[in-house]
Regions:
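Lipid deacylating catalytic domains
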Residues: 1-111, 115-417
Length: 417
């Protein structure tokens, strides 16, 4: 991470649009968690909107919930989508939207952490497709900004329980299987639990108001949520990411600005193999949890050749077809670049850059003080974990620097109106 933004101040004479914050998997976007970052962002220029979407829901469902929470009304997941995935078409009703004036004249900036990034990309894609009707337009989104987002999937989901050969099936007794049981239990009692335990599961009828205890036990035995194609875990698989890329999701819109912050804290170990691990200095530098340490090590030595179907990014490696299955073992392991193993404890570096490969998207892996719409700008932060910048505010130097940079970036965009 360079100090490019420190070299030039951007004029404050601009029209400020609100910044909508979208959290990731199992996260909550609210000011008491994200903390006192606003004074570093904009000196009271940009209004902030903390949005709430299903913390375990699929990207499609989260995008729909995001849209209707902003404009108001009853969440409509779409007739075709809901029928295909076996849940109700309509979700909760928002009597008052968080930003009901959202329009071409009143666009917004969006910031997504982790799964919040692909959620925002899915929202713009659905707007392009006319999912929300003819009035909604992708130009309503002035900029998309992301932090540590798994655009192209993550090997972490397989480590936690997703089957490498039969996703979205989950391995019994894995962390993912245990987590699904906890989510079903919390959702069952959600009508009487605090708001912090709100999983937005109305359309799936998972509470005691809709199902019996025997039905709950059946779902805990084999989850129709966790082992479906319409859930957050599956959307983080490489297979799901490939499907989104095939549909051209995430291709930059010509009048929207894009910026991603890619984080990593691992380094290549000594030797010929392309293994990555966390250094002792990084362990001392972060309030680092054992789960992130474990995931970072496993992700840094992951064998991609076990995944079926074979991820599309292997096609980007120029090797003969007859060695593809052995590409990531033995001598062929060195053929895959380091960014596939470098990670922040949750997401590999290459997946955080942007949707799709660099060869199929207009991107620039460098900072700029003169952003151009339709280009995906990527900046990389080393020695930075998945949780270093957001959501928990600890007033670290890297957190302050990120928000200062983001504020200058947004003002540079708004000066172009």
């Amino acid at each position: 991470m360079s100090d490019l933004w420190k070299t030039k101040e951007v004029s404050s004479q601009c029209q400020c649009f609100p910044l909508v914050i979208v959290q990731g998997f199992l996260g909550r976007a609210e000011s008491r968690i994200w903390g006192d970052f606003e004074r570093h962002l904009n000196h009271d220029c940009h209004g902030l909107v903390f949005d709430s979407v299903g913390p375990v829901s699929s990207l499609h469902d989260r995008a729909c919930e995001l849209y209707y929470s902003l404009v108001g009304g009853t969440v409509d997941y779409g007739e075709e989508h809901s029928a295909a995935h076996g849940h109700s078409r309509y979700g909760r009703t928002h009597a008052q939207g968080l930003y009901p004036q959202w329009s071409l004249e009143n666009p917004i900036h969006l910031l997504g952490h982790s799964l919040g990034g692909p959620t925002i990309v899915k929202l713009q894609y659905l707007m392009k497709q006319g999912h929300f009707g003819p009035r909604a337009h992708p130009d309503w989104i002035r900029s998309i900004n992301t932090i540590s987002s798994p655009f192209r999937g993550s090997q972490a989901v397989y480590t936690l329980g997703e089957r490498v050969d039969a996703a979205p099936e989950v391995r019994p007794f894995s962390m993912g299987a245990m987590l699904s049981k906890v989510i079903h239990t919390i959702s069952y009692f959600s009508p009487i639990l605090p708001k912090a335990f709100d999983f937005h599961t109305e359309s799936r009828r998972m509470s005691f108001l809709d199902i019996s205890i025997p039905s709950l036990l059946n779902r805990m035995w084999k989850s129709d949520w966790a082992e479906s194609y319409d859930a957050a875990p599956y959307d983080v698989t490489f297979e799901s990411a490939d499907q989104r890329e095939a549909n051209q999701e995430g291709q930059p819109h010509p009048r929207t600005f894009y910026r991603s912050c890619a984080t990593y804290l691992t380094e290549k170990v000594e030797g010929n193999e392309n293994f990555h691990t966390i250094t002792s200095s990084n362990l001392l530098s972060f309030p680092f949890s054992p789960p992130l340490y474990f995931l970072a090590r496993v992700m840094g030595s992951f064998d991609f050749s076990k995944i079926q179907p074979v991820p599309s990014f292997l096609d980007e490696i120029k090797v003969p077809d007859d060695v593809e299955q052995g590409l990531l073992t033995g001598d062929h392991r060195k053929s895959l670049p380091e960014e596939y193993w470098a990670n922040d404890g949750v997401v590999p570096l290459f997946s955080q850059w942007h949707p799709a490969s660099c060869s199929s998207i207009h991107c620039q892996h460098a900072e700029t003080m003169s952003p151009t719409p339709g280009i995906w700008y990527v900046e990389q932060w080393n020695n930075t974990s998945h949780m270093s910048l957001v959501p928990l505010w600890v007033a670290s130097d890297c957190q302050k620097q990120y928000w200062l940079n983001l504020g200058r970036w947004l003002r540079a965009i708004e000066l172009q109106n």
